[in-house]
Every structure is written in structure tokens, then in C-alpha cells.
Swiss-Prot record:
Species assigned in the record: Streptococcus agalactiae serotype III (strain NEM316)
Known role: Produces ATP from ADP in the presence of a proton gradient across the membrane.
Subcellular location: Cell membrane
Chief place where the protein resides: membrane
Underlying gene: atpC
Family: Belongs to the ATPase epsilon chain family.
Phylogenetic lineage: Bacteria, Bacillati, Bacillota, Bacilli, Lactobacillales
Organism superkingdom: Bacteria
Coiled coil ranges: none
Gene Ontology molecular functions: ATP binding; proton-transporting ATP synthase activity, rotational mechanism
Protein name, as recorded: ATP synthase epsilon chain
PANTHER family linked to this entry: ATP SYNTHASE DELTA/EPSILON CHAIN, ATP SYNTHASE EPSILON CHAIN, CHLOROPLASTIC
Disulfide bonds: none
Length: 137
């Protein structure tokens, strides 16, 4: 049975390197499923929960991906992301604190009507919520 080789790479190194039968990612245009034999492509990714169905019914892995790009070349899938964490590596307490900080920063930015700070806080909040969601899986 054909399978994908999936690597998730960040500036800190390889975060995930396994075989899979299916991966699901989210682009600005919506969700995309990648199966073995998928057409070659390069696409941008948004902050999302990447679902990886391991080969031979070995289970499902979840990875919190914070933007980046996906490249599919034959059956090799490479995700290059700003940051990424596997569900088992996420410290939920730390993620909750990051969410609270982002909420406070967003509230402050809205009060002062600072658009740049508001956007940064919104991104930080999306990332924290994504990490919490993946960490609970």
C-alpha cells in the first residue's frame, strides 16, 4: 500500500518525521486532504490543527501548525512552518497563559485603537487557542 512520508520542519529543526496514509491541512482557501499519489503542489498554510493518519492504522497524530507552507512532491510531504508542536509536546498550562496574555494585549490594543498591536494580539490569540485545542487531543 502506498504511503506518504511527512516531515514538519521549523527554524528549530524537524518536529515530525513519519509515514502516513492521509494528512489534512488548512490553507487560506480551505481544508485540503493529501493522499498518496497526490498531485505535486506548493501552498501557503494558516494557523491550524494538522491531522496525520499514520500508516497501517497506527492511529492519528495531531500537530499545531502556526502558518507556513506545504510542499507535496510525489509522496514526500514537507511542511515548513514558523513553529509547530505535536499534541503530546504541548504544555497546556503554558498555552493557557499565552492565551490570557494575548487576550489582555488585544483588549489594550482595542482600547488604544492601535491596529498593528491588535493584529499581533489576534495572531497570538489564534496560535494559543490552536495549541490548546491540539494539546487536548
Amino acid at each position: 500500500m502506498a504511503q506518504l512520508t511527512v516531515q514538519v520542519v521549523t527554524p528549530d529543526g524537524i518536529r515530525y518525521d513519519h509515514h502516513a496514509s492521509l494528512i489534512t491541512v488548512r490553507t487560506p482557501d480551505g481544508e485540503m486532504g493529501i493522499l498518496p499519489g497526490h498531485i505535486n503542489l506548493i501552498a501557503p498554510l494558516i494557523v491550524h490543527q494538522m491531522k496525520i493518519n499514520r500508516s497501517h492504522q497506527e492511529g492519528v497524530d495531531w500537530v499545531a501548525v502556526n502558518g507556513g507552507i506545504i510542499e507535496v512532491n510525489e509522496d514526500q510531504v514537507t511542511i515548513v512552518a514558523d513553529s509547530a508542536e505535536r499534541a503530546r509536546d504541548i504544555d497546556l498550562n503554558r498555552a493557557e497563559r499565552a492565551k490570557e496574555r494575548a487576550e489582555r494585549a488585544l483588549e489594550k490594543a482595542q482600547t488604544t485603537q492601535n491596529i498593528d498591536e491588535m493584529r499581533r494580539a489576534e495572531v497570538a490569540l489564534r496560535r494559543a487557542i490552536n495549541r490548546i485545542s491540539v494539546g487536548k487531543k
